[in-house]
């Protein structure tokens, strides 16, 4: 006996006459649309679902025994019982002449009404300006779970009533599942209220989370930690923008001549230019997850962590070189403006707010043109030099971290290279990258000169970097610290070896705990080797 899946009440079937739509002829133009390319799915794998349903079509039962909905436009004669289907209630029965009718109590399947949505909202059946301009539309974005419920029915309804498909591309997205991969449902109680997420993290953070790392048609798991990371990115954009606009208030920013642009300026302009080209290609292919990741990485890493930091020196020393400061501010404003346009489809609220303050004389960001690739913003050599600067900076920071040198301790940096063009370009960067390289002086040479014998070296493409060890480390203090670390590690290794030698532990403890202890022993052993090497190097 069938029962209701929620309350357990016995379900008693009642046979009743239903209204159907004959589907054979309606399905043909919908099938032809996909096969001729007039309609396409992204990703293409959903073509199969569409065609399988239409090529195995069954007549559509459109009557529902519920009160809410559009009532079936069928009227029964109170005298003879015959029915009339009409837009309005008939004045008299064509069979017996009776003037009294009762409308069918059934309502239309909700998908029957929804199938008319693309054109009914535009004034159809009247031939309105909106219908002529907006129909057919370009892209429909929807989930794979309603392809046959809604998408197919909109397509054949569009052909039947207008002679055209309602759209030419169907972009399919997946479902948002909980952190365990389960579909959200009331019965599981695992639903997420988007309004609560928006109140806590903001609408832009939620939007960014839902699209980052996702491919069309694939499900995603929802984690609050991801929304928090998106909120942090929004804060990063906001703070960088505030820094730029705060400094613009103190200066009249004018577009500089090309020859004034520094290598870092040319590099970031080249980067945002390449980003524009790549993102445009991604968006055209509906690779939204790839596109948003690229603009996220560009803003966070290349713009904020590198260019803004390099530009600070020039801005803070405007009295010494006002031309350079103006140039840096113009580049900051220009690149930020373009980055905001690229980010806008994904985070519309924060980008609109910032853009309105950044360039108040321009129209709304929503109404502005999408950025275009510019040939005159391609600077391959500047990009190459900047990659050298980044490699050198990372090498220095990694070496200092290995040697536990605090960031507030500055040292000389020697950069040795046989590439004269590279040295010339690095000369321009010297002052502005000192803070990034944690240096009090940067010395450039063609050959190793005036470098202490005990200086540590870092090999990067095109150059070798030397850091004087005496500037970095108090030898006695470091030896003492390393000795204590050696004692601690020996103690940990002895403890782990003792536990693993205990048969009761290895045979009775959970396997994951035993493995965790083995992992600790391996980790401590490697750390001890590194500490001993450091002690030897300080003798």
Residue locations for each model-derived region?
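Residue patterns forming the tRNA-binding/recognition surfaces of aminoacyl-tRNA synthetases
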Residues: 1-79, 150, 182, 188-189, ...
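Structured, non-catalytic alpha/beta "coupling" segments that mediate domain-domain communication
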Residues: 1-23, 227-252, 345-357, 424-464
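Glycine- and acidic
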Residues: 35-48, 129-143, 190-192, 215-227, ...
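Short amphipathic alpha-helical coiled-coil/interface segments
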Residues: 54, 234, 272, 276, ...
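Alpha-helical recognition segments enriched in aromatics with Gly/Pro capping
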Residues: 66-69, 73-79, 83-218
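Acidic, turn-prone loop/beta-hairpin segments
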Residues: 101, 178, 211, 251-280, ...
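Core structural elements
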Residues: 232-245, 265-274, 293-315, 359, ...
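C-terminal low-complexity, glycine/proline- and small-hydrophobic-enriched intrinsically disordered tails
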Residues: 357-539
């Amino acid at each position: 006996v069938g029962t209701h899946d929620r309350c357990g009440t016995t379900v008693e079937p009642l046979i009743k006459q239903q209204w159907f739509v004959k589907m054979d002829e309606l399905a043909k133009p919908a099938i032809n649309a996909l096969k001729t390319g007039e309609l396409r799915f992204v990703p293409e794998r959903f073509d199969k679902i569409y065609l399988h349903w239409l090529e195995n079509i069954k007549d559509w039962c459109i009557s529902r025994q519920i009160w809410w909905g559009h009532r079936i436009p069928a009227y029964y004669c109170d005298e003879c019982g015959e029915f009339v289907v009409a837009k309005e209630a008939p004045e008299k029965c064509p069979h017996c002449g009776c003037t009294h009718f009762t409308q069918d109590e059934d309502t239309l399947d909700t998908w029957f009404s929804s199938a008319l949505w693309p054109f009914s909202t535009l004034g159809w059946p009247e031939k309105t300006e909106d219908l002529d301009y907006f129909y057919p539309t370009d892209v429909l974005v929807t989930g794979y779970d309603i392809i046959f419920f809604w998408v197919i029915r909109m397509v054949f309804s569009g052909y039947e009533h207008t002679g055209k498909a309602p759209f030419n591309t169907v972009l399919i997205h997946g479902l948002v599942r909980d952190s365990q991969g389960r579909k959200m449902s009331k019965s599981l109680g695992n639903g997420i209220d988007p309004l609560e997420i928006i109140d806590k993290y903001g609408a832009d953070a939620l939007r960014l989370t839902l699209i980052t790392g996702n491919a069309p048609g694939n499900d995603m798991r929802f984690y609050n930690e991801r929304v928090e990371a998106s909120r942090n990115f929004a804060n990063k954009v906001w703070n960088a923008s505030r820094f730029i606009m705060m400094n613009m208030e103190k200066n009249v920013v004018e577009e500089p001549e090309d020859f004034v642009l520094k290598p870092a300026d040319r590099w970031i302009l080249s980067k945002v230019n390449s980003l524009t080209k790549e993102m445009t290609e991604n968006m055209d292919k509906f690779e939204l997850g790839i596109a948003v990741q690229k603009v996220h990485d560009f803003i966070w890493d290349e713009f904020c962590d590198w260019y803004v930091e390099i530009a600070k020196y020039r801005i803070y020393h405007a009295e010494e070189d006002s031309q350079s400061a103006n140039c840096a501010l113009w580049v900051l404003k220009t690149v930020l403006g373009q980055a905001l346009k690229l980010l806008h489809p994904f985070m519309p609220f924060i980008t609109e707010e910032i853009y309105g303050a950044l360039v108040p004389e321009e129209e709304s960001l929503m109404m502005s043109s999408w950025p275009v690739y510019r040939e005159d913003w391609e600077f391959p050599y500047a990009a190459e030099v900047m990659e050298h600067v980044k490699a050198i900076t990372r090498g220095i920071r990694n070496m200092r971290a290995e040697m536990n040198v605090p960031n507030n301790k500055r040292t000389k940096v020697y950069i040795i290279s046989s590439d004269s063009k590279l040295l010339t370009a690095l000369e321009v960067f010297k002052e502005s990258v000192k803070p990034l390289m944690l240096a009090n002086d940067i010395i450039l040479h063609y050959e190793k000169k005036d470098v202490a014998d005990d200086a540590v070296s870092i090999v990067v493409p095109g150059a070798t970097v030397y850091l004087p060890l005496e500037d970095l480390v108090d030898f006695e203090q470091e030896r003492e610290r390393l000795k204590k670390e050696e004692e601690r590690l020996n103690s940990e290794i002895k403890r782990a070896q003792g536990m693993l030698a205990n048969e009761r532990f290895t045979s009775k403890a959970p396997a994951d705990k035993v493995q965790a202890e083995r992992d600790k022993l391996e980790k401590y052993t490697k750390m001890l080797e590194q500490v001993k090497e450091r002690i030897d190097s300080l003798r």
